[in-house]
Amino acid sequence: MSLRVVRSVRAVACSLRIALASCPPRPWAPSAAAVRSLRTGSALLSVRKFTEKHEWVTAKDGIGTVGISNFAQEALGDVVYCSLPEVGTKLKKQEEFGALESVKAASELYSPLSGEVTEVNEALAENPGLVNKSCYEDGWLIKMTLSDPSELDELMSEEAYEKYVKSIEE
């Protein structure tokens, strides 16, 4: 037991570079070839951005996934029908592309970015309530190519959107 404690203390001291003597080799340490670097940049992160009309978008590899925010789905109530565009539809930023109908109201959908629709969430035809149950995951609406990825910079971050929602609730 004491030998194990000594090895642990020595390993900690070496990892903190406190040891006076040279550190013994660590067989559990990854080799230089096995170490992977993690880069973080706006092109690599899939961050959710929001519009003032309560749509959200995440972008990865030039494809944007679009849906409505939790605030919007709560305001709508139980979604019973989704009217979505066809694949191949070209959209401009803030252009109307469909509508959601609920037991309380109907709400138009607006494209957060410019691009072309590449996929429509077919599951919503059978189960439009996915928008309520999982608005950020299974309840997404469309996927689209981004014709101008710089438009993402004009949208609100999650924190800014939360502040925006609080300001309109007051």
UniProtKB/Swiss-Prot annotation:
Domain of life: Eukaryota
Cofactor: binding details: Binds 1 lipoyl cofactor covalently.
Subcellular location: Mitochondrion
Disulfide linkage: none
GO terms under biological process: glycine decarboxylation via glycine cleavage system
Gene Ontology CC entries for this record: glycine cleavage complex; mitochondrion
Residue interval of the organelle targeting sequence: 1-45
Stored CDD domains: GCS_H
Positions of modified residues (N6-lipoyllysine): K104
The keyword Transit peptide is assigned to this record: yes
Name the UniProt record assigns to this protein: Glycine cleavage system H protein, mitochondrial
Cofactor list: (R)-lipoate
Pfam families: GCV_H
Principal location: mitochondrion
Native organism: Rattus norvegicus
Keywords from the UniProt entry: Lipoyl, Mitochondrion, Transit peptide
Subunit structure: The glycine cleavage system is composed of four proteins: P (GLDC), T (GCST), L (DLD) and H (GCSH). Interacts with GLDC.
Family membership: Belongs to the GcvH family.
PANTHER family with a match to the protein in the record: GLYCINE CLEAVAGE SYSTEM H PROTEIN (PTHR11715), GLYCINE CLEAVAGE SYSTEM H PROTEIN, MITOCHONDRIAL (PTHR11715:SF42)
The keyword Aminoacyl-tRNA synthetase is assigned to this record: no
InterPro entries per record: 2-oxoA_DH_lipoyl-BS, Biotin_lipoyl, GCV_H, GCV_H/Fam206, GCV_H_sub, Single_hybrid_motif
Purpose: The glycine cleavage system catalyzes the degradation of glycine. The H protein (GCSH) shuttles the methylamine group of glycine from the P protein (GLDC) to the T protein (GCST). Has a pivotal role in the lipoylation of enzymes involved in cellular energetics such as the mitochondrial dihydrolipoyllysine-residue acetyltransferase component of pyruvate dehydrogenase complex (DLAT), and the mitochondrial dihydrolipoyllysine-residue succinyltransferase component of 2-oxoglutarate dehydrogenase complex (DLST).
Span of domain Lipoyl-binding: 63-145
